[in-house]
Curated annotation (Swiss-Prot):
It comes from Agrobacterium tumefaciens (strain 15955). It is found in: Host nucleus. Residues 1-15 have a biased composition (Polar residues). GO terms for cellular component: host cell nucleus. Its main location: host cell. Keywords: Crown gall tumor, Host nucleus, Plasmid, Ubl conjugation pathway, Virulence. This is Virulence protein F. Disulfide bonds: none annotated. In the host plant, component of SCF(virF) E3 ubiquitin ligase complexes, which mediate the ubiquitination and subsequent proteasomal degradation of target proteins such as the host VIP1, after its implication in T-DNA translocation to the host nucleus. Required for the formation of tumors of a wild-type size on certain plant species only. Residues 20-42 form the F-box domain.
């Protein structure tokens, strides 16, 4: 759901008012279910959708702050921030002492690995606030907590010219894969989360 999709085909917001009113009349647990469906397999889209939904009204903001959505957003912030850092590190690969040995195709593959496969680096720019330092929870949270260390361990040698440009790809690929897998697992967990009990009006 892009920003433009919040408007009708004529570009007018007026046609949306009745629909918005009907949406806000839904019970809390149904609003949360609606919000969950805004998390697509495209993390940039997910970040935009959830942010726009949250800004619509107090009820939609509360729906986004319920346990399944809030946890997903926290995970997305950490993953997207580190995908962005990994992407920055890869862009410096060509500046390494042996960087001239990298072909344009190899450089393109590196950039694609961190910027296209998980497009999370872009998603980071669509979120409010800083990511939590650490998540506390299940096995997936522990995996996500470890990703910043993995990114740092490859980014630092690149920044200080302590790694061969030809070795960067082998170091980056599993980290990029871990980030993408963690995002996919986080979304799957979100979609399978039980509905919260409605508390509005209590």
């Amino acid at each position: 759901m892009r920003n433009s999709s919040l408007r009708d085909a004529s570009g007018s917001n007026d046609a949306q008012v009745p629909h918005k009113t009907e949406l806000l009349n839904l019970p809390d647990h149904v609003l949360t279910e609606v919000a969950k469906r805004l998390a697509t397999n495209n993390p940039v889209e997910s970040a935009e959708n959830i942010a726009n939904f949250s800004k619509s009204h107090r009820f939609t903001r509360d729906a986004v702050r319920t346990e399944p959505l809030e946890k997903f957003s926290s995970r997305l912030k950490i993953l997207s921030r580190n995908a962005k850092l990994l992407s920055h590190a890869v862009r410096h690969a060509a500046t390494l002492p042996d960087g001239e040995q990298l072909s344009e195709a190899q450089l393109s593959q590196m950039r694609s690995e961190v910027a296209t496969r998980p497009v999370l680096g872009v998603a980071y720019t669509h979120q409010d606030g800083q990511p939590e330092e650490r998540l506390s929870g299940n096995h997936l949270d522990h995996k996500i907590n470890n990703i910043p260390n993995l990114v740092f361990n490859v980014a630092e040698p690149i920044m200080f010219n302590e790694i061969s440009a030809l070795e960067v790809m082998a170091e980056v690929r599993p980290i990029a894969r871990s980030i993408k897998t963690a995002h996919d697992d986080a979304r799957a967990e979100l979609m399978s989360a039980d509905r919260p009990r409605s508390t509005r009006g209590l």
